[in-house]
Structures are given as C-alpha cells and as structure tokens.
Amino acid sequence: MGYGWAGILRKYVVEPAHMWWPSTLVQISLFTTLHEKEEKKDGKRPIARVKFFVIALVCSFCWYVFPGYLFQTLQSISLACLVFPHSVTAHQVGSGMNGLGIGAFTLDWTTVASFLFSPLVSPFFAIVNVFIGYALIIYLVMPVSYWGLNLFNAKTFPIYSSDLFTAQGQEYNVSLIVNKKFEIDFPEYEKLGRVHMSTFFAITYGFGFATIAATVTHVALFYGREIYSRYQASSREKPDVHTRLMRNYKDIPSWWFYLLLAVSILLGLVLCIFFKKDVQMPWWGLLFAAALAFFFTLPISIITATTNQTPGLNIITEYIMGAILPGQPITNVCFKTYGYISMAQAVAFLSDFKLGHYMKIPPRSMFLVQFIGTMLAGTINLGVGWWLLSSVENICHKDLLPANSPWTCPGDKVFFDASVIWGLVGPKRIFGSLGEYSTLNWFFLGGLLGPVVVWLLHKAFP
C-alpha cells in the first residue's frame, strides 16, 4: 500500500526543490565521488576519490573490530560508573546502557548513528532541535520526575527500562493474563493487577503523543498554503531544473500506483475475511488503517524531506485500535502493521524517487527496481527470520541466553510490550480512567499548541 501512497503524493514531496531530502544527498555525494572523472588542479592531481574512499573504508572496518567484538565496553564508556562502580545512583545517572547516560560517551560510530541515523546527514537546525529535546528530557524532566516527584511511583521501577512491571516492581508475567485465543483473561488480570512501566518509558510515550500531534499542526501552519496551491494548480507552477530534465523521460502512469494499491488492499481484505481466525482484524479495520496511513503520509514525508527526522505512526495506530477493540493484541498488531508500516514504506519509496530525481534515473526504471527489490527482500527476510527462529535456541529469551548473546531482540521486545500495553490490556486500563498514566494524554494538547507558538515567533521574527 505504501507504493500507492507514494505515487499519489509525488508531486508534493518529490518535485518541489525545497523538499530536498537530506539523506539522499549523502548517497548522491558517494555516487558522484565514485563515478565522476577528476581534474587536475594547478598541475597536481590530488588523492583519488576512490582511493580515499577505500582507505576510509578499510580504517573504519579495522576500528570496528575493537568496539564491535574485542572490547565492547568502547560502545558506551560511563565516567560516573568508572568513578563510583558500586553506586546505584551513579549507574542510574551515568550508564549509557541502563541509565540516563549523563557524562557517558562512545567510541563506536554505529552507536552514534543507530537510532537517529548519522548526525552528519541532518541539517544543523534539526540537530539543534533534537539536542534541545534530548537535554530537556534527560537533564530536566527525568531527574525531576524520578528523584524529585517520584512520578508514577518511579523509584519502584528501574529508571530506564522498556519492560512491564507489577505494582511491587516485579516483572509482569504476561502469559498469566492471556487465554487460548490470545485475548485478555480478565479474572487473571484482576489477580495480577495493573501493568506498570518505568517512568522513562511512560514519558517516552507522552512525548510520542506530542510528536504526532505536533506533526499535523506544524505541516498545516508552515506548509498548508503551499500544499493547497499545488493541489489547485500544480501544472501551472514553474518547475525547477531537476523537474524539467526529468520530463525528458516517460513518467509512470498513475494507474500503476492505483492498481498496486487496489491489489494490496484487496489481498488484505482477503486475509481479514477468509483468515479471520488468524488475523483477528475486521475488514473495516484494514480500510481504517489505510485511511490513517494516507492521512499521515504527507505531513510525515514533508518533515522527513526537510529535517531528515521521521516521526513514527506506531503509537497513534496502537492507541486508536486499542481503544476500539481492547483485549485483542493480534488485532492491534495487524492494525499497526497496515497503518504504520505502509506509511513508513511510502516515505522510503518517496525518498528513493527523490534520489532518482536528482540522479536523472528514468521513473519507470526506478519503480520497477523498487517493486522487484521489495518482493525479493520481503521473501528473503521472511525466510531468514523463520530460519533464525528454528535454529537459534532460546532466541529473544534474554534470561535463557548466554551472557553477551547478540540474539536478545530488544526491538522485538519493545514491539511485544507495546502489543500488551495497547492491544492486550488496552489504553483505557493504562492511559485512561482505569490506568495510572491518564495525565500523559495532555501531551496531545501540548503537541498541538507547540508549533503554534513557534509559528507565531516565526511570523514576528522572520
């Protein structure tokens, strides 16, 4: 479905010159370095670009052996933990793995670029924005919430954890509250008690609420007029040089995208109707997820194209379906997959279109390569995942794996915990009137109003 959204929205986030997609410029720089002919300057030939690239590649590979395999401590060095190795507070404050990471640093580039991607790619204003948000949360919000206010009984739980806990701080045994249909067992849930989270995990969800609300407001205020004008008269707008050159190629017929979108939705409906016992999502859930993905693809694509930061749609999709059909985690996961993943796929496809736009790759060739690549990657990834699950003993079970095992699946653990929070237990029993974290819903309002303040300041001080 993401390819269909991308085809519909190309003229809004690919053709405009100011939708520059920072990450694509890095790829273009690499391709140019490897393929352009070099000219002598002042009769001297500088070091060949390819030679420099190979040297940097070899040096990077050799260095990664140390933090990646031989001395993994280099991935996160905490000064506070080194000075006070037996202090719990020092570990909470200074640990880069299980704490706030204040004063910690890394000598591993993959650690730097693993979550928010390379800081060398994002524009300076976006980096400053991310750093201010990081400093606000880590240096102010978290210390005040944990040590000052003991917010949500923070001291009962680890300061930094994505696990779920009981009210006494013990790990929540999710298997006890799941019945044979993979739905919540209410009598057992009442016995075990409410689900609790670490304060950091809870605040992360709060800022996630604010992020998705701020995305809509920001795009409406800063880009709403332009989107409307392009919708009204895109054909009369003077194209930039890249768009003019790309018109020398045959464009992709719109029906390619519409057909692919229709087939994808039809196959999804077949799964929902004829494999309802396995998928557990009603047919209207698929259509709702598709509509939600289409609505958010444009604003999130604009944010990505101008800042290299991509807000996630996972929280809002989980929240909505969890409120509509609580107690059904499989339904929630399927809804999130169709809503969030299709949007993420659309953003990635639009980024590839912009790369082809810059490099003057024929649009039809770009479409076919991406489509075939997606089919191959999807099949291979499924096969590799199935092979790992059947060949690696105790994979993703951290307590049963040997020390320093690479198969702990932290991302999948968060995905599972999210399915418990939003699908199995439901937002009403966690973020609603029956839960401990209802105050976090105010973050939605903060996210809606935040960009308004920035927009007013921008108008007053352009």
Where are the regions that the model predicts?
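Alpha-helical multipass membrane-protein architecture
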Residues: 1-462
